[in-house]
Amino acid sequence: LYVSVHATPWEARKVLLNNPRVPNIVDQLTRLAEGGIQFHGQMVIVPGLNDGEVLEQSLADLWNLGDAVMSVALVPVGVTQFSHLYNGQSMDAVNARLLLDTVHRWAERGLAERGDRWVFGSDELYLLSDEPLPGMEHYGDFSQIENGVGAVTSLRSRVRDGLSQLPRLDGKKIGIVTGVSMTPLMPELLDLLRDATGAEFSLITMENSLFGPTTTTA
């Protein structure tokens, strides 16, 4: 079961969900836990709304639910050209580093006290903050990969593992299309593919013409 948590404090949830009658999610999650139902959580972080003290309270509430919470992913808010009603801050390098500091602190607590990392930052946070992405062992069973957690690390591993199975393509020209965020990470993979196949690879970076240039993930 995957649950979009975003925040546990009621006042923050009312703003985030634009619903003055939003139910108490801690009560709802507690009911799941008492019923023996485990779940993964996702929190889309909007700077100024559910980071800082709100985030700390949210993670503390989730921590108190014990083994019912299998993992939590922190993902930066995506602001598109259609977000006309949104007047909050976008995620930048400074905010991303602060979020990763929080992730690492709670993850280390989980490892020390429960043997489980349990809180993860999305790949986009690492890219925004220019921090190196963790290795395969960091992500366990990759339970949050659909939320963009560990996707780049998994891709790198799958490319390396599959090189020996690729056919020779000497003289072929192949274009690889990706988004803005992935562009700096692709040359090392294209070099591996070129050496394994003999093909000539060209990297094509595309801006998102549907959601706008602030949407940079591929």
PLM feature spans:
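A structural preference for short, hydrophobic beta-strand core positions in alpha/beta folds
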Residues: G41, L74, G121, L203-T205
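Phenylalanine-focused residue identity feature
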Residues: F39, F82, F120, Y139-F142, ...
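Conserved AdoMet/S-adenosylmethionine-binding subsite of the radical SAM
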Residues: L1-R114, H138, E146-V159
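Short, conserved secondary-structure transition motifs
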Residues: V79-S83, L125-D130, F211-T215
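Short glycine/threonine-rich loop-to-helix capping motif typified by GTGT followed
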Residues: Y86-S90, L133, P213-T217
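Hard-cation-handling environments
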Residues: L99-T178, L193-A196
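Redox- and metal-dependent alpha/beta enzyme cores, enriched for Fe-S-associated oxidoreductases
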Residues: S164-T217
